[in-house]
């Protein structure tokens, strides 16, 4: 990957597949900015920006932030980035969001470069999530509230229902490639790199 040109990577995969771990490493080693819409939202709310003032009450009420507002927040974040070198982690979640993001990226002259889909068998994912909770307790940290088997299974089901149209969308555009998410983090990382063009 050259560092002087635009690069937009969107990680897809179920909860527990290792997207965050792999995205962080790719960002660090290839001078990409890892963007989390949640972090962007919280930053705007904390700074009291106009966009943050719109998003804050929705977030406090536990409501979804409308796609138009999310895209406006992303547009604001990418506006000063030259070249645009980002990894999206946790966004888009729907085909409508993907289509809106594509329009924005085309405006910026920075189309999607790659969409690695981390695939891991469901039972392995559930075991990873439950183990993550156990490890937190063993280290004296509070486990994430959703690091239990019942919640993990529900999250897998929701992921499958919500994400399949997104997988199909990026596959039709030729951006998607499947990565075997089993093995060591280094092995998975090498598979991610080998799939990028």
Swiss-Prot record:
Residues annotated to bind AMP: 37, 42, 63-65, 90-93, 97, 144, 155
Catalytic activity: AMP + ATP = 2 ADP
Region (NMP): 36-65
Chain intervals for the UniProt region annotation (Disordered): 137-158
Pathway in which this enzyme or protein is active: Purine metabolism; AMP biosynthesis via salvage pathway; AMP from ADP: step 1/1
One CC-aspect GO term: cytoplasm
GO molecular function: adenylate kinase activity; ATP binding
Region feature (LID): 131-147
Protein origin, superkingdom: Bacteria
Biased composition (Basic and acidic residues): 141-153
Protein EC: 2.7.4.3
Gene3D superfamilies for the chain: P-loop containing nucleotide triphosphate hydrolases (3.40.50.300)
Subcellular location: Cytoplasm
Pfam families in UniProt: ADK
A biological process from GO: AMP salvage
Annotated keywords: ATP-binding, Cytoplasm, Kinase, Nucleotide biosynthesis, Nucleotide-binding, Transferase
Positions bound to ATP: 16-21, 132, 183
Physiological role: Catalyzes the reversible transfer of the terminal phosphate group between ATP and AMP. Plays an important role in cellular energy homeostasis and in adenine nucleotide metabolism.
Self-association and partners: Monomer.
NCBIfam families: adk, PRK00279.1-3, PRK14527.1, PRK14531.1, PRK14532.1
Family: Belongs to the adenylate kinase family.
Protein's UniProt name: Adenylate kinase
Species: Deinococcus radiodurans (strain ATCC 13939 / DSM 20539 / JCM 16871 / CCUG 27074 / LMG 4051 / NBRC 15346 / NCIMB 9279 / VKM B-1422 / R1)
Gene from which this protein is expressed: adk
